[in-house]
């Protein structure tokens, strides 16, 4: 999944505005801001710390023991021309002064890395078997539509922390990526084109028992398990009208999707009891369950007219209690709580010196 939803993309998406019927309802007293990287009214954040400085860093996910982060980065200073996978210990390592350990091959493009049970291996997707070069980005379209590429060469692999690929989990033709692991350590959820559409699937951590979870037309992706492993939260852009369906299918035939409208959906891990969680309009994406399992944190630009900023929000799993968490004027996204519930990590454009750099930030979480 191409994740560079920043600045130009935000402007393009801002042309499609909608009304928000899920109003924020939570009220807090205003404390004095003492954290230098925390903005006013960010009540849930404490001791915000920048973990990287420079490049495009995102999708940082915690190890099971809440001590390590694995993430993807494009940063010329680190020798990467397109996303590669790195890991480090944010409690001890300084990723600003020293490049973290790269555990992908350095070939092709990678995405969506996640620790496996035991924290000695990582699952991620890569295009390197199809082509060792970085795959080309889509050219600007005559119709002006912003699109994401769905690279057919993406397959899912397991690597150790030295960068040795131990196993290839998917071998079907077409896109297989966006893998995340259940907190119970038994299942992986991922997005695949094997049915002819972008649907969610689960499999055992050894790649066996692949089971289709969703089956409605549209791009279902970015899925995560609930803390007890019983539910999935994901984002989807599901076309409704004949024209929307026609455009979706035409783009998909070109290996492209247009993520201008995305809402959050929740279901049981087997796909049952599927329901739409948000009806906010615009782009609502990268959801992750709160440690309680009763709320979801996600990124959204639904309150904007021009498509940005993106900020983080909380919502109850019954669709009530929408609350804004961050108050950035640019871009906050890719949130993940540590398994022990102490920390939140996210990607942001805050304090990037006016560049387009996206850096990782870590904060203590305050309920």
PLM regions and their residue ranges:
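Bacterial signal peptide processing site
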Residues: 16-18
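C-terminal motif of bacterial Sec signal peptides marking the signal peptidase cleavage site
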Residues: 12-14
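Residue-level detector of Asp-centered blade-edge/turn motifs that repeat once per structural unit
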Residues: 64-65, 117-118, 183-184, 227-228, ...
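Multi-bladed beta-propeller domains
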Residues: 33-56, 88-109, 159-175, 204-219, ...
